[in-house]
């Protein structure tokens, strides 16, 4: 029995690269077969077949079948050790969730697995699955549910010795707070995660995720694009080493850093480099177009890129946030350059020069006047912008402050001398 299963398993493996469907059918037949608990070889072959079948179903995009496999193998999991069962469940669930197939059953399937782990009294597996559920809540923007589960799970994990899972949950906490724009708490959670990670060996995937979040926090909170770039580069190398689809996201953020550092010419060099060529596609093309628009200071090209690559740019909250600021800066620079030669100019003329709608231009000019980016007024009756000369800086206030500071020093000196005499 076991010998026949081994032969079938080897045949299925040999067909993976040439005939995936035939390989899947053979693995299916091995997985469906009942095995005796005391037949170690047959149990081992069935374990490996489950993992191989799960991997093939994920690669061929068969999300529903993979979800079904996860439910089907539960009776078999009771007959093997808790550690092996936990590894199988986590591996299959990770494969299912990493597919990002958006079947709508992800949360439901994860909750089912958690209930099964509770019923079987498998605490470590339940905690690992709850961490995966937090990640799902985060991906589906259910942030309050994520924070609630994070709080409960962190209390448990701090009393136990599973440091790797603790790092994972602390990292998820940082991501959740960042998504809620609570940067101080996001930074604190990330610091806790990195401190915990320093005491253990971090798998490449987890280390890359830590580096990615560090780059995001540096970019969001401190606008420290050089440091953010170095973190994104580390994350990119980490994800690339394990062939993770997240590598292209890290590469996108690297390109974003170059654009925000006013180095758009370096974007092409990164994309055409040895590592960049491997990930060439719409994701990198989108940032390439933004870099070109930034280099040419062209708002029209910028708008065109945002329209053409909506999914790649607008749907990524990190990219979208920073590109909105970049667009705003670019618009201000263009407006200041256009109005510089004038003391009085029609708003429609400005809109025509920078190829934007009159309402958008009028709104931005109003904001710039309020922010004191230049001195002027909008005459809406005449539909013109009137620009004033830069008023001379009144130095009376600065001179008064300097005088008061000098007088304070004199008084302090006299006080010290009088104190010595007494």
From Swiss-Prot:
**Signal sequence interval, chain numbering:** none
Where is the PCI domain positioned along the sequence? 228-392
Compartment(s): Nucleus; Cytoplasm, Cytosol
Write down the InterPro entries for this protein, in alphabetical order.
Answer: 26S_Proteasome/COP9_Components, PCI_dom, Rpn6_C_helix, Rpn6_N, TPR-like_helical_dom_sf, WH_DNA-bd_sf
Instruction: Note the Pfam families from the entry.
Output: PCI, RPN6_C_helix, RPN6_N
Q: What's an example of a GO molecular-function annotation for this chain? A: structural molecule activity
GO process terms (BP): proteasome assembly; stem cell differentiation; ubiquitin-dependent protein catabolic process
Statement: the UniProt record of this protein carries the keyword Cell cycle: no
Q: Please give an example of a GO cellular component term from this record.
A: nucleus
State whether keyword Transferase applies.
no
Q: Write out the entry's keywords from A to Z.
A: Cytoplasm, Nucleus, Proteasome
> Coiled-coil region(s) at which residues?
none
Briefly state the protein's biological role: Component of the lid subcomplex of the 26S proteasome, a multiprotein complex involved in the ATP-dependent degradation of ubiquitinated proteins. In the complex, psmd11b is required for proteasome assembly.
Q: How does it assemble?
A: Component of the lid subcomplex of the 19S proteasome regulatory particle complex (also named PA700 complex). The 26S proteasome consists of a 20S proteasome core and two 19S regulatory subunits.
- Give the family per the record: Belongs to the proteasome subunit S9 family.
Protein name, UniProt field: 26S proteasome non-ATPase regulatory subunit 11B
Gene that specifies this protein: psmd11b
């Amino acid at each position: 029995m076991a010998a026949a299963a081994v032969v079938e398993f080897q045949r299925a493996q040999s067909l993976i690269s040439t005939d995936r469907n035939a390989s899947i059918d053979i693995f299916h037949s091995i997985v469906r077969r009942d095995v005796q608990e005391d037949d170690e070889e047959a149990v081992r072959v069935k374990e490996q077949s489950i993992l191989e079948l799960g991997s093939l179903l994920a690669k061929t995009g068969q999300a529903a079948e993979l979800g079904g496999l996860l439910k089907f193998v539960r009776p078999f999991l009771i007959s093997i050790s808790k550690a092996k069962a936990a590894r199988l469940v986590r591996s299959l669930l990770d494969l299912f969730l990493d597919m990002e197939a958006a079947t709508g059953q992800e949360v439901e399937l994860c909750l089912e697995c958690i209930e099964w782990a509770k019923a079987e009294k498998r605490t470590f597996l339940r905690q690992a699955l709850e961490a995966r559920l937090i990640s799902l809540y985060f991906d589906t923007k259910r942030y309050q549910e994520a924070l609630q589960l994070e709080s409960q799970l962190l209390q448990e994990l701090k009393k136990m010795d599973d440091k790797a899972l603790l790092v994972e949950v602390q990292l998820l906490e940082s991501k959740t707070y960042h998504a809620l724009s609570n940067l101080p708490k996001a930074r604190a959670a990330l610091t806790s995660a990195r401190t915990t990670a320093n005491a253990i060996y971090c798998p490449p995937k987890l280390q890359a995720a830590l580096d990615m979040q560090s780059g995001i926090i540096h970019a969001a909170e401190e606008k420290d694009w050089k440091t953010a770039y170095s973190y994104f580069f580390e994350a990119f190398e980490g994800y690339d080493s394990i062939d993770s689809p997240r590598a292209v996201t890290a590469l996108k953020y690297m390109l974003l850093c170059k654009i925000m550092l006013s180095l758009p010419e370096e974007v092409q060099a990164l994309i055409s480099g040895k590592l960049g060529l491997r990930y060439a596609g719409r994701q990198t093309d989108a940032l390439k177009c933004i870099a070109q628009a930034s280099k040419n200071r062209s708002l029209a090209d910028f708008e065109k890129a945002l329209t053409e690559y909506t999914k790649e740019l607008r749907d990524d909250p990190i990219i979208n946030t920073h590109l909105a600021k970049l667009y705003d800066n670019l618009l201000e620079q263009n407006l200041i350059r256009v109005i510089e030669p004038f003391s009085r100019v029609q708003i429609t003329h400005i809109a025509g020069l920078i190829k934007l709608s009159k309402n958008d231009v009028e709104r931005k000019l109003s904001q710039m006047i309020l922010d004191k980016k230049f001195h002027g007024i909008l005459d809406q009756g005449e539909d013109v912008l009137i620009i004033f000369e830069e008023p001379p800086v009144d130095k009376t206030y600065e001179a008064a402050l300097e005088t008061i500071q000098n007088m304070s020093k004199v008084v302090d000196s006299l006080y010290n001398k009088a104190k010595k005499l007494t």
